[in-house]
UniProtKB/Swiss-Prot annotation:
Subunit (UniProt): Homodimer.
Annotated metabolic or biological route of this protein: Purine metabolism; GMP biosynthesis; GMP from XMP (L-Gln route): step 1/1
Protein name: GMP synthase [glutamine-hydrolyzing]
GO cellular-component term (any): cytosol
Annotated PANTHER family: GMP SYNTHASE [GLUTAMINE-HYDROLYZING], GMP SYNTHASE-RELATED
Main function: Catalyzes the synthesis of GMP from XMP.
GO MF terms, alphabetically ordered: ATP binding; GMP synthase activity
Start and end residues of each Glutamine amidotransferase type-1 domain: 8-198
Length: 513
């Protein structure tokens, strides 16, 4: 965020798998928070002007050569600092304490015993369950610190130096297994750091509109509109900020869900008044893909062709200086931190040409996915768009296994519509993270109307998840599955068998290819 007057707590990234959760929990309290590289200097932090700092956990040992370090001057800024797990060990080590390998590693839920009163733990019980995940531990604390909590394997499970506003905890308050972790983080943010706790989507909208207007001035902005949640929210937000200075290009490649293209035009172009150039490129894409079966080849062709179509349309416009994108905070974290690891490449349609000389506008690049949905709701967008299912850039083309044909594509489009309709009617659409159908490219024998059939087998994939990184198959009611199956085989041509995918992630991925 460019506004240095905004109350914010920064989280220095030391590689913990829970880093994003720390920022999310602080935001849930009503205080803006963002991840930063552990390489940030005290001078840079002073310029950012946060009200507090959190040092995250991480896999390193502070005494190992090459372990992630910290600018020691950060502890001299006078700002409240909370060290979590590795962050606590690093703070203790840098300030004169001792850290050693634990004789017995501590992983999982453990009881934390508070030994004296601490503002950090105000309103929490004397004994509480917390999540421990560490192989090292502090064996001697720095001068000026005192112990406020212990666990069976950590005599220094919680320490503090109230004169310098420095706090350390060996456990992870950001995860739900630490039952009172949110209260502890709230105490740190609101009481120790003095935050007002008034950060909200309404404030975010006002700030972004102000930022966009200052950056863009009277110039023009181009947006690649996919119809998904992120680009749709960007479009509505920018429309509110700069009106007719925004032009959106919507490429219909022919692999969208049933009725999706019409809904985009009616809702975003109609109700919200976006200036949308719709490009009907179904034939252009299909001609390139007919008969192809390799999923990576399909993705590459669709990505490249999208770029070419977008480039063709963009070149017809004059005086465009800015390109808007729906980049989320998770994308920034994955690509921009020193500790990030990419678990799986995303399905998003390929990047835009390098020679397109635009300045970027990414108004969502400090938001998580759930916050984008909240923003869309605050902007008055309908649930059908705000709560739209995650959808891969290549669309239904990668939900057709084997060679791509119009016939197989239509089986997926029609069956997907039935699945979405029945899930919605059952009231489960907010409980299931993602659900769709796949043409497996397998044919089997069936009997319909006393006639032998030899038609396609479709798979239903439905998962539950918190963040999409791991997932379980959704245990949908049998009567609902039966109803969906019956409707599909009766209403969708060339289909005579339905199977249900009961594989979790891992070992499977969400999409089939």
């Amino acid at each position: 965020m460019s506004d240095t007057t905004l109350e914010k707590i920064i989280v220095l990234d030391y590689g913990s798998q829970y880093n994003q959760l720390i920022a999310r929990r602080i935001r849930e309290i009503g205080v803006f928070s963002e991840l930063m590289s552990h390489k940030v200097t005290a001078k840079e932090i002073r310029e950012i002007n946060p009200i507090g700092i959190i040092l995250s956990g991480g896999p390193n040992s502070v005494y190992d050569e090459g372990s992630f370090d910290i600018d020691p001057e950060i502890f001299e800024l006078g700002l409240p600092v909370l060290g979590i797990c590795y962050g606590m060990q690093l703070m203790s080590y840098k300030l004169g304490g001792m850290v050693e390998a634990a004789g017995e590693r501590e992983y999982g839920v453990a009881p934390l015993q508070l030994t004296e009163k601490s503002a950090l733990f105000a309103g929490t019980p004397e004994v509480q369950d917390v999540l421990m995940s560490h192989g090292d531990r502090v064996t001697a604390i720095p001068e000026g610190f005192h112990v406020v909590g212990t666990s069976p394997n950590s005599p220094f499970a919680a320490v503090e130096n109230t004169e310098r506003n420095l706090y350390g905890i060996q456990f992870h308050p950001e995860v739900r297994h630490s039952v009172h972790g949110t209260e502890m983080l709230r105490n740190f943010a609101l009481n120790t750091c003095g935050a007002k706790g008034n950060w909200s989507m309404e404030n975010f909208i006002d700030m972004q509109i102000k930022d966009v207007r200052e950056k863009v001035g009277d110039k023009k902005v181009l947006l690649g509109l996919s119809g998904g949640v992120d680009s749709s929210v960007v479009g509505v937000l920018l429309q509110r900020a700069i009106g007719d200075q925004l032009t959106s290009i919507f490429v219909d490649h022919g692999f969208l869900r049933k009725g999706e293209a019409d809904q985009v035009m009616e809702t975003l172009g109609g109700k919200f008044g976006l200036n949308i150039i719709k490009v009907d490129a179904q034939k252009r894409f299909m001609d390139k893909l007919v008969g192809l079966s390799d999923p990576e080849t399909k993705r590459k062709i669709i990505g490249n062709e999208f770029v070419y179509v977008f480039d063709d349309e963009a070149n017809k416009l004059e005086g465009v200086d800015f390109l808007a994108q729906g980049t989320l905070y998770t994308d920034v974290i994955e690509s921009g931190t020193d500790t990030a690891q990419t678990i799986k490449s995303h399905h998003n349609v390929g990047g835009l040409p390098e020679d397109m000389q635009f300045q970027l506008i990414e108004p969502l690049n400090t938001l998580f996915k759930d916050e984008v949905r909240a923003l869309g709701t605050q902007l008055g967008m309908p649930d059908e768009i705000v709560w739209r299912q995650p959808f891969p850039g290549p669309g239904l083309a990668i939900r057709v296994l084997g060679d791509l044909t119009e016939e197989k594509l239509e089986t997926v489009r029609e069956s997907d519509a039935i699945l979405r309709e029945e899930i919605a009617a059952s009231g489960l659409e907010r409980d299931v993270w993602q659900y769709f159908t796949v043409n497996t490219d397998v044919k089997s024998v069936g009997v319909m109307g006393d006639q032998r059939t030899y038609d396609y087998t479709l798979a239903i994939r439905a998962i539950t998840s918190i963040d999409g990184m791991t997932a379980d198959f959704a245990q949908l009611p049998w009567d609902l599955l039966q109803k969906i199956s019956k409707r599909i085989v009766n209403e969708v041509d060339h289909v005579n068998r339905i199977v249900y995918d009961i594989t979790s992630k891992p070992p499977a991925t969400v999409e089939w290819q």
